């Protein structure tokens, strides 16, 4: 597998000495399914948003094989990087009043200028959106309003929207946080299938150890904005799990 992204000594601060991410280094490979594992507040969401250029790091670098250094990119390079980097959000980030199909079509906007995007999108985009909906098992809901879907179905719409971007990387921020166990398995299985069949790198943040072990090729454990472990999922030890959640347990006790 080829290296897709290289992150070196990355730090993100929201004020003096208030680091959400601190001195993080790791790489992502094509077609790799990686889980960012850690409790709430560990810095996982901030890290994901920095990889997509939505949050600016205060130090360090993010190097893309296709777009160079992200933090130093021109507006055009950054726009292309974001098009190649799809996001799947915890709260779906869908427009409830629009149809499922229209929400999925928004994943194609990065391929058009602002003025062109104000017009109806080409039929070829519509066909891509329908194909994505068929793949996530929602073709029969294409004309339904998003607000009428269950939480699990809405998350599948979010994944279909990511698919039509034709990305090289999918970043999924706690995509199963509000779902029941059955729906959680469906969503993670779908992301894993996309990763394996399409050779798209997937980086997903989770706090559930059992799901991380079940689905990840590699687990990057985070606590207090730092990487605690970075290794194959089968090699994650109980002592490392304890280290990931220790500060939360200590806070609960006190």
Curated annotation (Swiss-Prot):
Keyword Nucleotide-binding attributed: yes
Give the chief site where it resides.
membrane
Q: ABC transporter domain: which residues?
A: 5-249
Q: What is its EC number?
A: 7.3.2.2
Top-level taxon: Bacteria
- In the UniProt record, which is one GO cellular component term? plasma membrane
Instruction: Supply the enzyme class, top level.
Output: translocase
Q: What is the membrane topology noted in the UniProt record heading this document? A: Peripheral membrane protein
Output the InterPro entries linked to this UniProt entry: AAA+_ATPase, ABC_transporter-like_ATP-bd, ABC_transporter-like_CS, ABC_transpr_PhnC, MetN_ABC_transporter-like, P-loop_NTPase
User: Where is the protein localized?
Assistant: Cell inner membrane
Q: Which SUPFAM superfamilies match?
A: P-loop containing nucleoside triphosphate hydrolases
Please provide, alphabetically and separated by semicolons, the GO molecular function terms listed in this UniProt record.
Answer: ABC-type phosphonate transporter activity; ATP binding; ATP hydrolysis activity
In the record, the note on similarity to other proteins reads: Belongs to the ABC transporter superfamily. Phosphonates importer (TC 3.A.1.9.1) family.
What is the official name of this protein in its record? Phosphonates import ATP-binding protein PhnC
Q: Origin organism of this chain?
A: Synechococcus sp. (strain CC9605)
């Amino acid at each position: 597998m080829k290296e897709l992204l290289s992150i070196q000594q990355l730090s993100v601060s929201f004020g003096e000495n208030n680091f959400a991410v601190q001195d993080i280094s790791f790489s992502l490979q094509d077609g790799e399914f990686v889980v960012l594992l850690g409790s709430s507040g560990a810095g996982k969401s901030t890290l994901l948003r920095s990889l997509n250029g939505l949050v600016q790091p205060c130090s360090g670098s993010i190097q893309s094989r296709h777009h160079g250094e992200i933090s130093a990119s021109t507006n055009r390079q950054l726009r292309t990087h974001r098009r190649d980097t799809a996001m799947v959000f915890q709260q779906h980030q869908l427009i409830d009043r629009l149809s499922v199909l229209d929400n999925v079509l928004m994943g194609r906007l990065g391929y058009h200028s602002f003025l062109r995007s104000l017009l109806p999108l080409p039929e070829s985009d519509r066909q891509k959106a329908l194909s994505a909906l068929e793949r996530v098992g929602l073709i029969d809901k294409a004309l339904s309003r998003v607000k009428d879907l269950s939480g699990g179905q809405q998350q599948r719409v979010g994944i279909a929207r990511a698919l039509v971007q034709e990305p090289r990387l999918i970043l999924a921020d706690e995509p199963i946080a509000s779902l029941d166990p059955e729906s959680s398995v469906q969503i993670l299985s779908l992301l894993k299938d996309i990763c394996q069949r399409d050779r798209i790198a997937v980086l997903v943040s989770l706090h559930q150890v059992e799901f991380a072990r079940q689905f990840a090729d590699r687990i990057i454990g985070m606590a207090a904005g730092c990487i605690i472990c970075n290794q194959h999922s089968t090699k994650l030890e109980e002592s490392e799990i304890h280290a990931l959640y220790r500060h939360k347990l200590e806070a609960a006790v006190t």
